[in-house]
Structures are given as C-alpha cells and as structure tokens.
Regions:
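N-terminal first-folded block
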Residues: 2-37
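Solvent-exposed alpha-helices and their adjacent loops that cap or buttress functional pockets
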Residues: 1-3, 43, 68-69
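Short secondary-structure boundary segments
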Residues: 32, 54-56, 80
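C-terminal structural segments of small proteins and small subunits
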Residues: 64-86
Length: 86
C-alpha cells in the first residue's frame, strides 16, 4: 500500500515568509484577502497538509479560517510577524 505524500506551505506577506523559503518550504506571497482565500483553496486541493499563515493576513479572513478550523486537512497554523502577536 503506497502512502500519500503531503506538502507544507507558507502564506503571507512577502517579507515575513521569505525565511521559510530558505529552509525549503513552498511559499506563497499574498497581498489581499481575496488572494489569500484563493491560495488557501488551491493549496487544500493540492495535498498541502500544513499551511503556515501569517497573523496579519489571517486577521483579514476570519470566516475562511473558521471553515478550515472544522476540516481535518489542511491544518492552518498562524505565525506572528514583526508586528507582534494578534
């Protein structure tokens, strides 16, 4: 039985997610709420099991986060930015 391989992604503003690219995660820079929602939908369809999301971007999409909070996958984990914790 073959096991499924899942991916890890990082979504947020470009400056905040750059360090994650250096350690090998796939990064997805976004600039607005609509773009964040579209990226999350795409990543959830493309076998991303863990998505790190910057808190400043997460604050723009509370309804979308509430939806994904009820799903098994992907797990969305908020990460603070230089602006501090929400």
């Amino acid at each position: 039985m073959a096991s499924k391989t899942y991916k890890i992604g990082v979504v947020g503003n470009r400056d905040a997610i750059l360090p994650f690219r250096l350690i090998g995660f796939q990064t997805f820079p976004v600039t607005g709420a609509a773009e964040v929602v579209n990226v999350l939908r795409r990543l959830s369809r493309e076998d991303f099991a863990i998505i790190y999301l910057t808190e400043d971007v997460a604050a723009e999409i509370p309804e979308t986060l509430a939806y994904y909070d009820k799903q098994v996958l992907p797990a969305i984990i908020l990460i603070p930015t230089h602006k501090g914790i929400m």
